[in-house]
Amino acid sequence: MFDLLSDRLSQHLEQIVRERNPFFSSQGHFYVREYLRQELGQWGKFESHFFTFQGKVYENLILDLPNNSQKPLILIGAHYDTVPGSQGADDNATGLAVLLELARFFGENQANYPIRLIAFDLEEYGLLGSIAYSEKLKQTKQDLRLMLSLEMLGYCDKNPHSQKYPAFLEHFYPNTEDFIAGSSRFCVSMV
């Protein structure tokens, strides 16, 4: 099972890892957006959320997974743009590959809560895609149970002191880059 998952994650990375900055690598940006649209569209109700920046239209890709629950929504997102000159292998192809496999898993196995997966655009320019989408949620008064942002999931360095923190935090967290952190307004937890 894990070999198959590993193979699928690798296949996604082969398609996503490329320069895909929306301003300097528009062909790569378009290619990855269409790949995500195709992959996400297999698993539930797919739609686009359009927003504008500097007079141009950009697109967040949204998948609502099948679920009849009236419970508050769980939102899971990852961004698909990159900084200029970067293929974005870890920032954020790894998050997108996991997002696509979550689509597969929850498309085949209904969750107890409704789940919405979103591939955000223009995150590298000030979180513009997620801000535009959060404004839409606020306008529609959408209840959320939680939001998970899948960001840079593929890096691991077990060498001591490979992870740095501000001085006041260094005693609370590991000094190796081999963990996943979850944060909210209320707490930070390490896995």
Regions found by a protein language model. Give the residues of each.
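Proline/glycine-enriched tight loop/beta-turn segments at coil->beta junctions
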Residues: 66-73
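Short beta-strand element of the alpha/beta-hydrolase
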Residues: 73-79
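Extracytoplasmic
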Residues: 58, 71, 110-112
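A non-catalytic alpha/beta surface segment that caps or lines the substrate-entry region
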Residues: 8-66
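A mature extracytoplasmic/lumenal domain signature
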Residues: 50, 67, 80, 121-123
